[in-house]
Structure formats: structure tokens, C-alpha cells
UniProtKB/Swiss-Prot annotation:
It comes from the Viruses. Belongs to the serpin family. Poxviruses subfamily. It is found in: Host cytoplasm. This is Serine proteinase inhibitor 1. It comes from Vaccinia virus (strain Western Reserve). Signal peptide: none annotated. The keyword ATP-binding does not apply. GO terms for cellular component: extracellular space; host cell cytoplasm. The keyword Ion transport does not apply. InterPro entries: Serpin_CS, Serpin_dom, Serpin_fam, Serpin_sf, Serpin_sf_1, Serpin_sf_2. The gene is OPG208. Its main location: host cell. Plays a role in mediating viral host range. May act to inhibit a caspase independent form of apoptosis to allow efficient virus replication in infected cells.
Length: 353
């Protein structure tokens, strides 16, 4: 949550999306080559991040069976002019590759092609410009997620509706509709404002959690006040409700990758990127991480595969049931998590692309 909060401070009126699992995985790879105070900082930070995941699920492998695509791309690129220790290379295996940073354009194309392959073409370009020829090591993290809704939205119900970017700025979106579904929902009033939380399940073990402020511009107060502890507390208050859900189709694709170096430095990882960096378990030369790039892509729509295109007739006793209507028509926060509570993605959507 802390990396996300740092990012949204820098991108106040922009869509933001990161994958904490992917970032943590890459930091864990770096930790294999770290020593001294660098290893201490990395180990402490990784431990703190793992405290916010279930005890039995602190490995970086995420299991989302048969129902979703989770394509991740994590890699460390090291200069071919440096001799890296065999013990380090053995630990990280396929996550490391040597390149000639003097051939800047060739290296750029190599990295972009690898990312494109690893994400099944969903992320076509991570690097928009060549890396510096002085680069000695670069960390790259990319991820793409796609899943089928447990309760698919009917395409014929999708309609054009208003989306309030702010109280004074309105645009149009394709609004998806899903009615009479039993979903996990709660409305909460905090000192900083009221908001609704709704848990929308995918087939299998994952779900999307939406935090929708009551006020059109209330997302800023949620951003300032949300913590991992508060999020867990709020999710513990969810209960099953009959919901009519109105949710915009949306797509978030980064035009430029995030360079997380300054953010990670602000969060205490100062001995990774600067003069005091100690990666002596990686190689004998004095090197430091110069870039920590992260990019993401997400596509939220009505789609489902043929395997889930099943028609069923269910008969029940008729009764008058109060249904809660949830209109997601202004900026909101969202998380995609597995059934253990591990957050795979966290994002803010405030500006239709």
C-alpha cells in the first residue's frame, strides 16, 4: 500500500495501477545478491510487506487456477562487462540476463520484445527511449491480468452514461450492468467521509474490490487515510447483499513505465540505489541499481470465455428482496486480490482513457 500511496501523491489526477506482488518478487530477486546494510534494508522491507499477506502465503507464487490469466515479467539485466558470481546466477536462474548496454537501441528492443512475449502481447513497449550507455544493471517488472467474472455482465445491457471526473468535469463511459447478484458489500462512515466497498468475484479464487466514495471528489480523502490495516478492517465488515451493479468498462495502459527508484528511496531503501549499495554477493564490482521500472495493463469489460457461456434456468420462491444499487460513476479505488487476501493489483481510476 505504501508504494501505491507514494505514486498517487505524484499522479494526483491520473489513473494509477501497480502490482505489489510483482514488485515484491523483484525485490526478493535483488535480495539474493545483496550484502551488509543493503541486505538488511531489503530483508526488512520485504518482511514488512509480507506482514500484510497471509502467513501461509508469503511466497511469491500466486495460484489462480483455470479461471484467469496472470502474466508476469520480472527480470534483472546486468552488463556483460561484469563477471557475476555463479552462486548468485544459480539462485535467480531465468530472472537474470547479461546485455551490452553500449548497444543502447539493441538492448531497448531486446527488453521490449521480452516483455511483449511474457505478457502475451498485452504490453508491447516498456522502454520508450534507450537506456544510458553507463547503465550497469536495470530491474524490469511488468504484469498483465485477465479473468472471467463469476457473474458476467450482459453486453446488451451496457449503455452510455455519465462519469464525473470531478464536480465540474463530466465525460461519457460505457456502463456495464449486472443485477440481482448476491455480492459482498458494506457502506462505511469514517471521519474523512463515507464510502462503499463491494467485492466482485471472478471465477475461481480472485476478486475485484471497489472502494467508491460517496462524494464525487472523495477519492482524495480515501487516498490520504487508507492503510493496509484499515483495508483489512473494512473488508472484515463485508456482508452479502443483493446488488444491482452499474460499473464502467475501463482500460488502463501505461504510456510511460513508473521508475520506482525515488519512491523506494523515500520508503527507506536508500542503500540500494546510491553510493552505499552493496551487491557483493552478486559480483566483485561496485554496482548500484540505476532504474526500477514497472508497467501494467488491465482491461475490465463484460467478456467471458465460451467455457462459461452457459444458460441456466433456476426456479425459486418469489419474494420481495431489497436490492442495493451501486453506481460507479466517479473516481474510485480498486484492488484485485486472491482468496487469501493477497493484493495482486491496486489502482485508482479517475480519468476514462
Amino acid at each position: 500500500m505504501d508504494i501505491f500511496k507514494e505514486l498517487i501523491l505524484k499522479h494526483t489526477d491520473e489513473n494509477v495501477l501497480i502490482s505489489p506482488v510483482s514488485i515484491l518478487s523483484t525485490l526478493s530477486i535483488l535480495n539474493h545478491g545483496a550484502a551488509g546494510s543493503t541486505a538488511e534494508q531489503l530483508s526488512k522491507y520485504i518482511e514488512n510487506m509480507n506482514e500484510n499477506t497471509p502467513d501461509d502465503n508469503n511466497d511469491m507464487d500466486v495460484d489462480i487456477p483455470y479461471c484467469a490469466t496472470l502474466a508476469t515479467a520480472n527480470k534483472i539485466y546486468g552488463s556483460d562487462s561484469i563477471e557475476f558470481h555463479a552462486s548468485f546466477l544459480q539462485k535467480i536462474k531465468d530472472d537474470f540476463q547479461t546485455v551490452n548496454f553500449n548497444n543502447a537501441n539493441q538492448t531497448k528492443e531486446l527488453i521490449n520484445e521480452w516483455v511483449k512475449t511474457m505478457t502475451n502481447g498485452k504490453i508491447n513497449s516498456l522502454l520508450t527511449s534507450p537506456l544510458s550507455i553507463n547503465t550497469r544493471m536495470t530491474v524490469v517488472s511488468a504484469v498483465h491480468f485477465k479473468a472471467m467474472w463469476k457473474y458476467p455482465f450482459s453486453k446488451h445491457l451496457t449503455y452510455t452514461d455519465k462519469f464525473y471526473i470531478s464536480k465540474n468535469i463530466v465525460t461519457s463511459v460505457d456502463m456495464m450492468v449486472s443485477t440481482e447478484n448476491n455480492l459482498q458489500y458494506v457502506h462505511i462512515n469514517e471521519l474523512f467521509g463515507g464510502f462503499s466497498i463491494i467485492d466482485i468475484p471472478y471465477e475461481g479464487n480472485s476478486s475485484m474490490v471497489i472502494i467508491l466514495p460517496d462524494d464525487i471528489e472523495g477519492i482524495y480523502n480515501i487516498e490520504k487515510n487508507i492503510t493496509d490495516e484499515k483495508f483489512k478492517k473494512w473488508c472484515g465488515m463485508l456482508s452479502t447483499k443483493s446488488i444491482d451493479l452499474y460499473m464502467p468498462k475501463f482500460k488502463v495502459e501505461m504510456t510511460e513505465p513508473y521508475n520506482l527508484v525515488p519512491i523506494l528511496e523515500n520508503l527507506g531503501l536508500t542503500n540500494i540505489f546510491g553510493y552505499y549499495a552493496d551487491f557483493s554477493k552478486m559480483c566483485n564490482e561496485t554496482i548500484t541499481v540505476e532504474k526500477f521500472l514497472h508497467t501494467t495493463f488491465i482491461d475490465v469489460n463484460e467478456e467471458y470465455t465460451e467455457a462459461s457461456a452457459v444458460t441456466g434456468v433456476f426456479m425459486t420462491n418469489f419474494s420481495m428482496v431489497y436490492r442495493t444499487k451501486v453506481y460507479i460513476n466517479h473516481p474510485f479505488m480498486y484492488m484485485i486480490k486472491d482468496n487469501t487476501g493477497r493484493i495482486l493489483f491496486i489502482g485508482k481510476y479517475c480519468y476514462p482513457q
